[in-house]
């Protein structure tokens, strides 16, 4: 649910979401099933008068998430972990003149944990409440030739993880001949490894054990990943109306990069396998390009390719799930106002690690369509894996063959 009310100079936005994911692991796994329950509430105000000398935005969010089963303890009475995040964000922008402005942005996350977080017999706690604070001041210039964004990310953490980190927040674009752009950027910042991000990386992943024999069966929260730098140089051009191409190359450095790998253990009667979240410092060099064409918003075509070369300091096996090359192609057709049709192809080849099983490359040809039946009511459908290929989104878990998804969307 997402509702926005527009005032003269302000937008008020209220939104809420609920999610439930209940699924089984593959045969032979240490756990046989998992259940994720999530919900969130959002309320914010957005100042929309761009001519005002002083503008502001503010929002607050309440996010809740429960992981029902954790680390090889499915048969224990209660191993659920509950995560509550109180997220507050705001920024204030002051205009220097029509082309220049200065902004100070703040974001605070309060993490609260309950459930299977503490060893009752020893008192050791493996999921501690903590707070993160981001300070992001920046200067912006926007004129006919230059677009500059110069700032810094100052990340503080209280109660868990490294206390102080700093990364750049810089983007520069030079525009010439109206449709040619040379750009450079150096960005970074904290990537919160909350339960939602764990699910997005691998829903079948188990949290890391606390590593002490006296605490066997208890798990711990991963450190937050920090993007120390993601620097890119690129060139964009539009030599013909509706046509754009973009070539780029860059370097990314990640501290405590979150990944996962396959492990196994021998039980009394059989061998059990599981996927375990792990972390290491990684970096990667990347180059790529993309081209797009749009004809009067009726037909649009786009293609993109990126190649990456990864390196891990100590845990090279974690790179086996990383993308080595990514290619995509998309065709969008909008023949009438009510109908949208998409045909897309995605190919993702994973990094090859010596002595470790290579994941089958993602090879997905899919088609989708949406149609506005009435005002605010639309019907949609998607069909994936039209080629009926065998590949893996997650290590050891083959993707479905030819599959279909459809539904209704309401907007009021």
Regions found by a protein language model. Give the residues of each.
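Phosphate/ribose-recognition catalytic cores of enzymes acting on nucleotide-derived substrates
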Residues: 45, 62-68, 80-84, 91-103, ...
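Outer-membrane beta-barrel transmembrane domain signature
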Residues: 89, 95-97, 109-136, 334, ...
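Amphipathic alpha-helical scaffolding segments
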Residues: 18, 62, 78, 108-110, ...
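Surface-exposed extracellular loop regions of Gram-negative outer-membrane beta-barrel proteins
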Residues: 1, 105-112, 116, 126-157, ...
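Flexible loop and strand-edge segments within Gram-negative outer membrane beta-barrel domains
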Residues: 2-87, 115, 121, 125
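Exposed, low-structure sequence patches enriched in small/polar residues
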Residues: 147-149, 153-412
